[in-house]
Amino acid sequence: MYQVLYRKYRPKVFADVYGQEHVTSTLKNEIKENRIAHAYLFTGSRGTGKTTCAKILAKAVNCENSVDGEPCNECEVCKGLDSGTIYDVVEIDAASNNGVDNIRDLREEANYTPSRGKYRVYIIDEVHMLSTGAFNALLKTLEEPPAHVIFILATTEVHKLPATILSRCQRFDFKRIQPETMSVRLKQVAKLEGMELDDDAAILIARIADGALRDGLSILDQCAGRSKKIDSALVSEVAGLAGREALYKLTDCICTQNSSSAMTVISELYQNSYDMERLCVEMINHLRNFLIVKTVKDSRGLIICTDDEYNSIILSAENFTLENVIFALDLFQDALTKIKTGANARVELEMAFVKLCEPKLDVNIDSLVDRISKLERAVNRGVNVSQQP
């Protein structure tokens, strides 16, 4: 049976975990110095390596031949944990096992000594989903666990955890993986799989994945199902993106105040089954790039794209004033909010573009122009503007 890429290339040692060196180096040192905590909390956005690091840690503390804090993956314990024939590492999904009874069963089970390794390790994923009663039941065990037990809690929403739980765990915050780091890993995997992944496509996948390497590998997997030669056009098609050309066409329509052309582009995208909500998000990200180049002197490091695309962004942004960009961002953010609450996505997008192409239609612009005119007249008369109501 075919194994998806993110499972096939899941790291088995800390050295293979990308973008989380601040976490892996600390964990390795703790294992080397035998300063292993009784409870760990791994928090961060999805796809950043929390569960992967938890599994590596569980193997490393039980490994018979651990070297430099890493599991050897060759001893009987490592192989048994990988194959599931040794049951000293228990993975629990708190989303479906979130009741008091589930935690009470866990507490009773934790009293048994490990069958083969040194520790019984409990990995509780999505721990924020536990009920209040379940947290209370877990509290005492976290405070005074048996010497042979280690808890590893993983969550994407650490703010939902009680302070009493947080204070009893050693916390590690997983960062979003940088696009440059992710694109390197994607190209490595593509090469191993016999794919041709160009630089533009790798950067685009990293941008869509938004810091989650698992998502990036899933997109790469989808693209490989279509073709072994992967370019940015294929990635855009697979991910349902409008593509750079469409975004630049739409921004040109705003510059020339051509609402008719904007409607035509939106209609073509809609007929080709592009997601209108996704298009709204893409426009926000596209205009955000304009905002960055117009406000930051050295903006290259803040924009995720190739050098050619960066030059295109700079050229296109010259057609907008900073005020225009901020106003457009406000309109699209407002449209996105309405779309998420159930409004018709296509209509909201069309309204936003018409307002941008026909500024006088927006009453907010009229009121702003009127206020500016009043302030200018006050300044000309020598009135202290700061004292005006």
Language-model segment annotations:
Residues M1-R171, V189:
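P-loop/Walker A NTP-binding region and its immediately flanking N-terminal helices
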Residues V23, S83-Y87, N102-E108, K118, ...:
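Extended, largely alpha-helical regulatory/partner-binding modules appended to the mid-to-C-terminal parts
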